[in-house]
Amino acid sequence: MNDFERSVDFSHRYLDVLSLRQSVISDNIANIDTPNFKRSKISFESELEKAFLNEDKNDLNLIKSSDKHLSGFKNLKYSDVKPHRVLDHFSTMNNNGNNVDIDSEVKALVQNQMMYHLMTNVQAHYFKSINIVLK
């Protein structure tokens, strides 16, 4: 996969993650008054960073004398990184057991919308470049 294809693929995947995050944040806000509701968030960037940092390193292939032995370390590719929904069980904001803080959710919502807008502009730039080359 060349750099251009990889960039388009990455931005497309990241737009999907941002869309999922938007849904989770909206769900948190919608349940702000629900007793014992625990907020969720999407975890993605930290694992993606690990995949990018380890991308150029060689896999560690070990020779096993038994099937019960551990196998070698395989580097995770960025395309294999999946977003995970994480529940926050450890904090409580309200007396009813709900832990949704409207200020932090609105802040996360705005940040997510700005990132989504940025990534759609990046996608548009990629395809404008293709259009210019094809003319």
From Swiss-Prot:
Compartments, as annotated in UniProt: Bacterial flagellum basal body
Coiled-coil ranges per UniProt: none
Superkingdom of the organism of origin: Bacteria
UniProt keyword list: Bacterial flagellum
InterPro entries linked: Flag_bb_rod_N, Flagellar_basal_body_rod_CS, FlgB
Membrane spanning stretches: none
One Gene Ontology biological process: bacterial-type flagellum-dependent swarming motility
GO cellular component: bacterial-type flagellum basal body, rod
Any Pfam family: Flg_bb_rod
Main subcellular localisation: other
Role: Structural component of flagellum, the bacterial motility apparatus. Part of the rod structure of flagellar basal body.
Assembly mode: The basal body constitutes a major portion of the flagellar organelle and consists of a number of rings mounted on a central rod. In Gram-negative bacteria, at least four rings, L, P, S and M are present, whereas Gram-positive bacteria lack the L and P rings. The rod consists of about 26 subunits of FlgG in the distal portion, and FlgB, FlgC and FlgF build up the proximal portion of the rod with about 6 subunits each.
Similarity remark: Belongs to the flagella basal body rod proteins family.
Entry protein name: Flagellar basal body rod protein FlgB
Source organism (scientific name): Borreliella burgdorferi (strain ATCC 35210 / DSM 4680 / CIP 102532 / B31)
